[in-house]
Amino acid sequence: MSEKYVVTWDMFQMHTRKLSERLLPATQWKGIIAVSRGGLFPAAVIARELGIRHIETVCISSYDHNQQGNLNVLHAAQVKNGGEGFIVVDDLVDTGNTARAIRELYPNARFVTVFAKPAGANLVDDYVIDIPQNTWIEQPWDMGITFVPPLARK
């Protein structure tokens, strides 16, 4: 990855609330399936905004911080009718590998992400922000606030 896109908590909240608006009316949804781990954060915001209390998870491992590896389904939420009436939420669709596995598990769910890269954008039903394919996203939950020394030292 040659570029980085740093997401602050404020940006994340704003983008996720925008995504939530697109999911109204809330009464059409039975619940949310959050893709662990990155989808847990936007799922919490969407659940709050839409008043949804039923939250399931699907746990898929494919990243080791900044390297994508083999896909491994660790846990899949058991919902009826291919996820009909559920919103599947992830933070990002990148290459589409995870998204394809999600689509197989929940073909009738509404699949949304906050961010999308070109290789996977067509695999989700909605997203808010386009990200170039060669860009690494630094999510706020992966960062900490630290002291940065001034440029001019005395």
Swiss-Prot record:
Key words, A-Z: Cell inner membrane, Cell membrane, Glycosyltransferase, Magnesium, Membrane, Metal-binding, Purine salvage, Transferase
Subcellular location: Cell inner membrane
The keyword Chaperone belongs to this UniProt entry's keyword annotation: no
A Pfam family hit: Pribosyltran
Pathway where this protein functions: Purine metabolism; GMP biosynthesis via salvage pathway; GMP from guanine: step 1/1; Purine metabolism; XMP biosynthesis via salvage pathway; XMP from xanthine: step 1/1
Reactions performed catalytically: GMP + diphosphate = guanine + 5-phospho-alpha-D-ribose 1-diphosphate; XMP + diphosphate = xanthine + 5-phospho-alpha-D-ribose 1-diphosphate; IMP + diphosphate = hypoxanthine + 5-phospho-alpha-D-ribose 1-diphosphate
UniProt-listed Enzyme Commission number(s): 2.4.2.-, 2.4.2.22
Primary residence: membrane
Bilayer topology annotation: Peripheral membrane protein
Gene Ontology terms: cellular component: cytosol; plasma membrane
GO molecular function ontology, one term from the record: guanine phosphoribosyltransferase activity
Binding positions (xanthine): D94, I137
Annotated Mg(2+) binding sites: D91
InterPro entries linked: PRibTrfase_dom, PRTase-like, Xanthine_Guanine_PRibTrfase
Cofactor(s) needed by this chain: Mg(2+)
Binding site for 5-phospho-alpha-D-ribose 1-diphosphate: R37, G38, D90, D91, L92, V93, D94, T95, G96, N97, T98
PROSITE patterns tied to this protein: PUR_PYR_PR_TRANSFER
Family designation: Belongs to the purine/pyrimidine phosphoribosyltransferase family. XGPT subfamily.
Assembly information from the UniProt record: Homotetramer.
Function: Purine salvage pathway enzyme that catalyzes the transfer of the ribosyl-5-phosphate group from 5-phospho-alpha-D-ribose 1-diphosphate (PRPP) to the N9 position of the 6-oxopurines guanine and xanthine to form the corresponding ribonucleotides GMP (guanosine 5'-monophosphate) and XMP (xanthosine 5'-monophosphate), with the release of PPi. To a lesser extent, also acts on hypoxanthine.
Protein name listed in UniProt: Xanthine-guanine phosphoribosyltransferase
GN (gene name): gpt
